[in-house]
């Protein structure tokens, strides 16, 4: 229950989605609809429309940071997080290209950056497809592999970030036209900020968990933890050393909870060891070996099944399946309450 509370999954503190993102540090945003729901279940009274508006206004941003995948981040954090992550991200991108037997030279990246800057300058926002068409016109490689790298590199170098959605499609804008430049912390300050953000919102968690979530080396992660050690308490459980942040709520009144957890949610994906909340024998029903994560049913903080949502214009249908094949008969009221919350969120 402590982790549920830290993650804002029970008794959420915030009514504004931008405050949730700032609290969490970063929220994985692989699948846009599921990622918005991840914000919604952590924000009191939030709706899908409110979250879309926050994205459109630039109050939260979607970009590749930390690990080389999509995350929602706060405008106040995006620059220092990118600076902390950039070298590792570039190394990961180079490895991906090498795996395809391809390379991108620095000159190609610089040329792509200039073209992207020119086409977005003046407050414009464009989709990936629109940028791809213009890159192709300039004579650069424009297939999916190259465009992914060009755009990810431009994000990494703090050239671009998310713009207002075009319908439900992600767009890009120049970061400098979306977020005012601001002083950057030193590396030690950035490490401590990232450690504080993680442990206050994900505790109890281990150093290995923090390494996994942040993409930092063990040395960097340990330094970040050491800098804020006065804010942390150590708890040993099952031969693992967990860290609790001073802000962690120990006295939690809630005894029971039932949550439809989105795919790729921080409650599962943000930890290297997931056995605390997911029985190992059920791993294959929660995620695949190549990193696809499924929506889960959480009962009292433990994953007990899967759920699938079907949206129509008038209703939301939810199909559930439980890992132990015996659908609990006493959960109909809990399921219906969670379904009504989904309806309220989708407005």
Q: Predicted regions: what is each one?
A:
Residues 1-126, 133-137, 141, 280:
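Phosphate-backbone binding and catalysis cores of DNA-processing enzymes
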Residues 54, 127-136, 154, 207-211, ...:
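A short acidic, leucine-rich amphipathic alpha-helix
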Residues 58-65, 69-70, 155-165, 229-237, ...:
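A short, conserved structural fragment
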Residues 107-124, 187-203, 225:
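Positively charged, polyanion-binding regions of nucleic-acid-associated proteins
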Residues 144-222:
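Loop-centered beta-sheet repeat module
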Residues 203-252:
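Anionic-ligand-binding alpha/beta catalytic cores of soluble enzymes and soluble regulatory domains
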Residues 231-281:
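Non-catalytic regulatory appendages
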Residues 280, 286-347:
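Glycine-rich, small/acidic residue-mixed loop/short-helix segments
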